[in-house]
C-alpha cells in the first residue's frame, strides 16, 4: 500500500477484483503473504509480458525498464558455478534475476507450470512451447574428513562399512541422488538409515569438514578442500555423473537470449 500510495483498504479491494476476474484466490492471507498456485502462475505471466514489452520498447526506440527474469535452479549449481552466470549476465543486462530454488528433478515441472521462464534440469526433453540444450555433466563423489575416517573407518573402507556410519542428505529429493550413487557406483541396495538431513549447501560441506558425516558432493564444490587434504574421496574411482540441461520458454527476448548465452558459456567451462 505504501509503495503504491494507496490505503490498505484500496489495495484489498484491488486484490478482490483481481481474484474475481481470474476466478480464484491469488494469495494466502498469512504473515508473510504467500501466493497461491494461481497467483504464482499469474505472477509468472506478468513477468513474461514485462519481458516482451521490454523487447518491444527497445525495438520501437522507446525507453524500456529492465524486466525481471524468473528461473529455477538447483542447490548444487547455485553453490558452484551459477554466480559466474550472474556476473557475466550482469555485465550486459540490468534485468533482475529471480531464482526459485528447487531440486534438478523438480525444476522442469516448475517451468512447465509457467512459474518461471527458464530452468536447469536433469531432464532433457523440452517443455511445450520451450527449447532445451545439454550443458554438460555435474560429477559427484563421496567424501569424508580424515578425522571421520580415523573415527569410523580405520579398519576398512568398503561400501558396507561406509553406509553403516553417519551420512548426510540435503532433503527428501536428495534421496534420489544418493540412491543412484549407491546402485550405479557402489553396486549396493539403497540405505539411508544412518543419514542426517541438513538443508544447507554451505552447512552440507561444513558437516563433512567437521568430521560429523560423509557426504555426496559435487567435485566442483570441494576441489580446494580435497587439494588441501581436508576432505578425502572415499571411493576415488567411483563417480556419479548427472546430466544437466538448460530449458527456456520460447520468447522474443534479447535479455533471455543473453542469459541463455551466459549459461552455455559458463557451463562449458565448468562442466565436463
Regions found by a protein language model. Give the residues of each.
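A short LG(V/I)-centered, amphipathic sequence patch enriched
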Residues: 17-37
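Helix-turn-helix DNA-binding motif, specifically the short coil turn and the N-cap/start of the second
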Residues: 5-10, 14
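Central regulatory/effector-binding core of bacterial HTH transcription factors
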Residues: 66-128
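Flexible hinge/capping segments at coil-to-helix
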Residues: 132-168
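Secondary-structure junction motif
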Residues: 163-188
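A late-sequence structural motif
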Residues: 234-272
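Alpha-helical linker/hinge and terminal dimerization helices associated
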Residues: 21-22, 42-63, 263
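Hydrophobic hinge/microswitch elements
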Residues: 188-233, 239
